[in-house]
């Protein structure tokens, strides 16, 4: 298999048609695609978040993260989905913990001050599904967990910037497709890197978008706002069904 054909192996045909020219014409293409072991996630998982978008559904929620998890076993190709975590009793990263804590707060069954032990008890008492089940069900309901950068190589700022620069035009093409194929798109920005796409969305000329902003879930001030309530408020305003986050 030639290096140039690797995209056909890891992108579904529709997305290959939409994204391949942007990727193949990037001067850093070889750097990103000729060494399968250079970065996380595994190459076959890099486009998971894109390949599983159901374009037939006219209302979409796009949750922007920043970078993949810096561990091969954790990086899934989706923002915030940590593949290493199979049970709520596993060690949770701050981002993962705060994301689900915020969902519980939105239902009034948790408080900002609750520690991890109390959160686990609440999850057990409510018989809430596993972490993997949550993400799988949300994806089927067309919640799109999209990182601003699709790959991670190292924590050096120069590397973070290199990856972000490579993926930025790709993410822009994805955004255009989502706006073209949808009645409404709710873009959820968690973290400063993802906010850089706001101006691009506005400048596309489309009017079918809505914004939800918050800090990154790794920080405790993530709970100063509740993005999950904000998403449902927008859905209610545009006469769409609200999302039952605990029973997606």
Describe each PLM feature range.
Residues 1-11:
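Low-complexity, highly charged intrinsically disordered N-terminal segments
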Residues 198-248:
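C-terminal accessory segment of soluble enzyme catalytic cores
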Residues 9-182, 195-196, 210, 216-222, ...:
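A polyanion-binding, active-site-adjacent surface
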């Amino acid at each position: 298999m030639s290096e140039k054909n690797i995209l056909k192996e890891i992108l579904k045909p529709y997305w290959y048609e939409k994204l391949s020219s942007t990727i193949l014409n990037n001067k850093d293409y070889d750097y990103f695609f000729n060494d399968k072991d250079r970065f996380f996630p595994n190459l076959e998982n890099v486009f998971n978040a894109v390949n599983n978008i159901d374009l037939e559904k006219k209302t979409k929620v796009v949750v922007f993260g920043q970078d993949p998890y810096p561990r091969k076993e954790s990086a899934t190709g989706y923002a915030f989905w940590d593949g290493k975590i199979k049970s709520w009793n596993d060690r949770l990263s701050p981002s993962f913990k705060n994301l689900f804590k915020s969902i519980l707060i939105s239902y009034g069954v948790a408080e900002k001050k609750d520690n991890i032990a109390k959160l686990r008890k609440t999850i057990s008492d409510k018989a809430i599904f596993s972490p993997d089940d949550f993400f799988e069900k949300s994806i089927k309901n067309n919640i799109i967990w999209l990182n601003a950068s699709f790959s991670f190589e190292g924590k050096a700022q120069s590397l973070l910037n290199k990856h972000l620069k490579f993926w930025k035009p790709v993410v822009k093409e994805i955004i255009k497709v989502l706006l073209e194929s949808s009645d409404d798109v709710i873009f959820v920005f968690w973290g400063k890197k993802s906010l850089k796409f706001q101006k691009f969305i506005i400048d596309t000329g489309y009017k079918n978008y809505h914004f939800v902003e918050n800090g990154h879930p790794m920080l405790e001030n993530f709970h100063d706002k509740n993005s999950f309530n904000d998403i449902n408020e927008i859905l209610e305003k545009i006469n769409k069904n609200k999302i039952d986050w605990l029973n997606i």
